[in-house]
Amino acid sequence: MTKIRSQFPAVFLRSLVFTIAAAMLAAVSPAQISQSKIVRADLPKPEIDRIVKKFTDNEFMFRQALMDYVFNRSAEIQTIGMGGQVTGVYRRDSFMTFTGDGRRFERITFFPVSTLTEISVTPEDIEDLGGVNPFALEPSAVAEYNFTYLGKEKIDELDLYVFDVSPKVIPNPKKTSQRLFTGRIWVDDRDLMIVKSKGKGVPETKQNKFPVVETWRENVDGKYWFPSYSYADDELVFDNGLSVRMRMKVKYTDYKLGRTEVRILEDDD
């Protein structure tokens, strides 16, 4: 079975420009989305370590905060034929809210019959689209990754640190269901928050292949960077020789605080 998975947390004016740019991504091509103009530069290792510690701390805090927000999610997955025509579509629109006892609950608002025939979407895939990036770059996971600082890139009004991220050891899929992230992240140089990521999950298996997904985030309530738009246009090549081109678009909108116990942890740094 083929699994399609999502990749993927207070300065208002700066974040507003970045949010508007993310909202416009649906109208641009994959090549435009992926353009990168990194200015190569070195930083002392202690400074790199400080940046990594700060943005991983923030990532943990924002993931916890996201669980207290309701939002709308629109997900569409397409398979693309040799001539560029759409050969199958999976569409699922949802309102992500809570049950009476506070658990996350997906209320489906639009879910037509899927016409996908070459790949399938599993319940686990849908769970990944719930809004919380399954590849947690949090303090507890830092030891599992190599973070390579590449330099800086300016996107709209934001100056961003750019890091390549790769697992030190690829998990053995025969022994564990753990997946790790391999790809690239962009970190705001003032607030030290991840505002963009591009990568995929590893390991892959004979039947489960994952696309490279690019995710942009938007500033919510002036303090959190939550997923805004995810996009993939990739070719999945399976061990039996089957090759499937797929395209995925996921939009997250209308974030609202659904519970009141969200707290911002102040950092003394």
Stretches with model-predicted labels:
Residues Q32-T182, D189-K196, K200-P211, N219-P227, ...:
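Structured extracytoplasmic
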Residues M1-L13:
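N-terminal secretory signal peptides that target proteins for export/translocation
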Residues M1-I4, A26-S29, W225:
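Extended interaction regions within the primary functional domain
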Residues R14-A27:
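Bacterial N-terminal signal peptides
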